[in-house]
Every structure is written in C-alpha cells, then in structure tokens.
C-alpha cells in the first residue's frame, strides 16, 4: 500500500490523471497483492490465470472496504478503482483497451515501485508480481516516499528474455 498526493500526478499520461475521474481528488492510495513466485515458473499458465483472477477480486474487495472505512473515519469521499475492468473501450481483435487509470503510474506515484525497461512495474520485494488497485479520495493524506529505481543500469535480463524482442534499451 502507498499514498500519493496530486502533485505526483502532474505528468500522468493523457486522460489517465486521477482528477480526470474525480476532480476533487487530493490523494491516491495504491494497493497491491503479490502472486506467489512459483506461478510464474510453471507451464501451462493455467494456474497463473486462475489465481490471478482470484487476486484481482481480492484487490477489488480491499479497495472497496478501505474506501468505506476512509469515508467513515476521515469523513471523506472515496472512489475505489478496480484492478482490472471496466474499460472505456476494448478491441477484441487486438486485445487492447483503455482503462480508467494507468495502475503502473499510480503505483509509482504512491511509492510502490518503478517502471522498468520491460515497462512493467517493479517492486523491490515482489518484482513484477503485484496486482494493483487504487482509491481516489478528497482526504489529503501525506505522500509516501517515491521508490528508488531498482533496475540495474547494465542489466539486460528482461531484454534478453523477451520472446518477441519487443523491449528496446
């Protein structure tokens, strides 16, 4: 979990700023649950898919419950943001869509991790295994420190292991 004030979102991608969704937003809370390492080390990926779906629902339950607690305890207004859906649009053919926020950018702004060369969110403890959700609120919480970049400049592990060579240095 991490907290980020709106000053951290001045360079949010176009149409992905928290204030685009909730103009009175003063703070964003990012929540992440890590999948076990082993799920990324087995084939087929059916196990990963099964448990990732479960974790998505758990993250949604956490942000929903936490939003209600914050509204009660801090007399605030909260907008829980789900981990996966909904999308503004979804292109079935290309398997691409536009969500409500960039959860990776939210997590960076809230101090949970940094975006690596692979364009994945990297957390110092959990690597790229976090499933993320968020809460937008009008309560002005103190921001957590920004996470240090954990990418080793000379490292090319993600570039070398990309099966379609999509990652450029």
Language-model features and meaning:
Residues 1-57:
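Non-catalytic, usually N-terminal nucleic-acid engagement modules in DNA/RNA processing proteins
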Residues 12, 48-49, 54-169:
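Catalytic cores of enzyme domains
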